[in-house]
Amino acid sequence: MNISKTLLICAGVLMLTACATKDYSAESLKHYTAKQLLTTGEQALAKHNYKDSIKYLEAIDALYPFDPEAKQSQIDVIYAYYKAEDYASALGAADRYIHLYPSGEHTDYAYYVKGLVNFEKDRTWLQRIHPTHAEELDLSTLQDSFVDFETLIKLFPKSVYAKDAEKRMLHIRDLLASRELQTAKFYFDRKAYIAAANRASYIIKHLEGAPQVLDALKIMFKSYRALGAEKQANDVLRILQMNFPKEHV
């Protein structure tokens, strides 16, 4: 038997084995009722056995999509995927739940987990231990996380997750402002004053209350002065003196 034919047969065997394993797994769970699957899945979840938990919880949706246990399994599996650090699947499960139950009992939780996932999904383990290095973070996922928490608070202001979501929004705001300020300083140091002023302006307009607002105003003032835009510089100076009377540029 030649090598290419042998490899072809092996590949076919592997494909059949993979398919058979998948089919066997589904078949092996058919003798469970929806309630048994939910109980087993939640027990595995409590033991931090996320892989098994996901298998049982997902089986409910596949085998018993219209049973009352399906709705609970859909919220449980969001948490299981999140804890397993399968962030893409966690987001998919959360989005599906939100689509199916836009005003559901646990929809606030789905938004909350989306916010957590978007904050953590592109960070390394080192960034999770030392989250202050804003220059290393992905701004787009931070912004997505901010929007998730913001949506949660708007739609479910009395949610048990609302207070923590608000705290996380403030933290994200400060990280975004820190990143924008670093960029503004980068442009200013290279005499790209228009770009520096624009970055600083973004902080003031969109990240109100961040500790970086003071430095952003200073960069705007100095940038406008360097550009010879005296009117804009004086406008910024008035705002600076009004809000930070003890500061000097």
What are these regions (language model features)?
Residues 1-19:
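Sec-dependent bacterial lipoprotein signal peptides
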Residues 18-249:
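Acidic, polar-rich low-complexity tracts and alpha-helical solenoid repeat scaffolds
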